[in-house]
């Protein structure tokens, strides 16, 4: 989203009614599928995300389904700044291939060397269901699922296996009201659940 010069005249730059379905992405660099950054990101710097914020600046009617991402350099699938996004029936295999010191050669520059499988960022009431993620490569996250800095994320009926960072992370203080139920984890490494500074 580009920042509008005259927001009152042109309206807010945001995504509505986006559907990504039936795609096969292979050997991309930083992301497999990502929707959609916001030029108003500073407005979302809080734990409890009010509906009014999404009414004004959030993305609406985001649907990501039946996609397959493999051999991705970073994250598999991420939805950002969205109200009630639905992410279902997606599969990922061998993601985070570039999250290592060959690509991030400065040890003190930790910022970009993180990736997870299928996850929302700064979204509200995100539903992620019937997804599968396998073989997330080791990095500073590397979990299949990541309830990251959002309000009301629900993971249910997902299947993860052989992910080097584990099954799920509840990431940082601004990830609240999350639920993780009826999911199956098989041979995920590095621990099943990572609270990572989460208050819940």
Predicted regions and their residues:
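A generic structural signal for short coil/turn motifs at secondary-structure boundaries
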Residues: 9, 76-77, 169
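Active-site-proximal loop/turn and secondary-structure-junction residues that shape catalytic pockets
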Residues: 4, 37-39, 83
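Right-handed parallel beta-helix
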Residues: 14-30, 43-75, 83-107, 114-117, ...
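Extracellular beta-strand-rich solenoid/capping regions of secreted or surface-exposed proteins
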Residues: 1-13
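Extracellular loop and loop/strand-boundary signature of outer-membrane beta-barrel proteins
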Residues: 6-8, 115, 142
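Extracellular beta-strand solenoids
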Residues: 2, 35, 79, 120, ...
